[in-house]
Amino acid sequence: MDKETLSTLEGTAKRIRRGIIEGVYHAKSGHPGGSLSIADILAYLYTKEMHINPQNPKDDTRDRLVLSKGHTAPALYATLAECGFFSPEELKTLRKIDGRLQGHPDMKNIPGVDMTTGSLGLGISAACGMALVGKTEQKDYRVYAVVGDGESEEGQVWEASMFASHYKLSNLCVILDWNGLQIDGPVEKVMNPDRKSVV
């Protein structure tokens, strides 16, 4: 990656982080740590990797993203605003009772959200379903799933991973956000995985 591209991505990630902080500040609640830890990932995916169209968010040929760690919705919202799916001003309505930017992503109400998530561990299964449909119907889209390190302790994550391998879902990309923290504390103290076998 050249320096100019890297500089552009850093600027995008910085604006996404600003959007996260602004939304959580106005909401007076949220999950800023986990949201901030995926800003670089989302900046790269949405501006350099994924084929998306903010003017046609339900385009059948678009790439899809499943934010399995749904509590980090502020990061997804800030990214979608950065890409033009809705105004950045709307980030100030995060978690407001009459707003559409709630604590977890809602695919029915927010343009650019491909899967409603919230319960940890379910995202890879949903992404596998999307990828299998794409493969079966010979569609040319890719599916990305962003998964938290804490939720990787869920059995369903491993079952879905075996499913993806069995069906050779080459159009699926799972990204593990290894920030070392989960709600119960440091991941290594809650359920110490062998990092070498995971990464």
Language-model features, listed with the residues they occupy:
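Short, contiguous strand/loop micro-motifs
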Residues: 7-8, 29, 63, 78, ...
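Structural motif
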Residues: 30-36
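A short, conserved beta-to-alpha structural element at the edge of catalytic cores
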Residues: 166-192
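Cofactor-binding active-site loop characterized by glycine-rich and histidine/acidic residues
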Residues: 20-23, 36-166, 189
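N-terminal capping segment at the start of a domain
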Residues: 13-29, 177-178
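Conserved small/polar residues in nucleotide/adenosyl-binding loops
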Residues: 198-199
